[in-house]
Amino acid sequence: METPSSQPEHRSLLGLVLRLAALTLVGGLLALLVWRVVNAGQGGRLVNAVRKHKKPIAPDFRLGVLWPHAETWPRSTRNLVRSKVELRSLRGRPVVLNFWASWCIPCAHEAPRLVAAAKTHTGRVLFLGVDVKDFSSDARKFLRRFHVNYVSVRDGGSGTYDAYGLTGLPESYFLDTRGRIVAHKIGEISTVELEDGITQALGGGR
């Protein structure tokens, strides 16, 4: 049975535990904030490097496959579509990297153009969608609605969003065969812009 003298000790111990828990939480939040700031800074530098035509290497990622339809991919690369896709494993082929979300109206506007371009360049150019800030169920409905004919992966956090310096959706990056970014489009992409980026990606590996 607790004595009156032991009760203050228990309260003191409980207070210490609560303070330590609060400090741990604050420390974790600060670490997350620092990580976001650093990543966002790296993303900004990446965008600036692309703007200056420095052809930086695209930040690597390994993300879960949301949509495994690889019918427009070269047959030799279709075995890469498992539970996850690693960007660096796609080197050797030009890549159109499209960041999107199901709630994004401009993403819906450009989706048919991406599907058409993927079909036109079947076997020559890899189209890869990256779904961000979205629900998986809504994203799959979007992909079914537009009969998307290329693979999409999903980032449930903000890693790729920050690493690529995204300022909104959609955004598209064009990678050459060496994994270097040769073109970048912010916002809804037109057919002309899409073909121009693909031309740069096809020629950029030389």
Regions found by a protein language model. Give the residues of each.
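Short pre-active-site segment immediately N-terminal to redox-active cysteine/selenocysteine motifs
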Residues: 93-95, 100-103, 168
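A short beta-strand-turn-helix
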Residues: 62-95
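Conserved segment of the thioredoxin-like fold in thiol-based oxidoreductases
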Residues: 109, 119-157, 169
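Conserved hydrophobic/aromatic "anchor" residues
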Residues: 61, 70-71, 85, 99-100, ...
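Conserved hydrophobic packing residues within short motifs/helices of P-loop NTPase cores
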Residues: 95-97, 128-130, 173
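N-terminal targeting signals for export/organelle localization
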Residues: 1-74, 206
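Conserved redox-active cysteine motifs that mediate thiol-disulfide chemistry
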Residues: 99-116
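Thiol/disulfide oxidoreductase modules built on the thioredoxin-like
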Residues: 141-149, 154-206
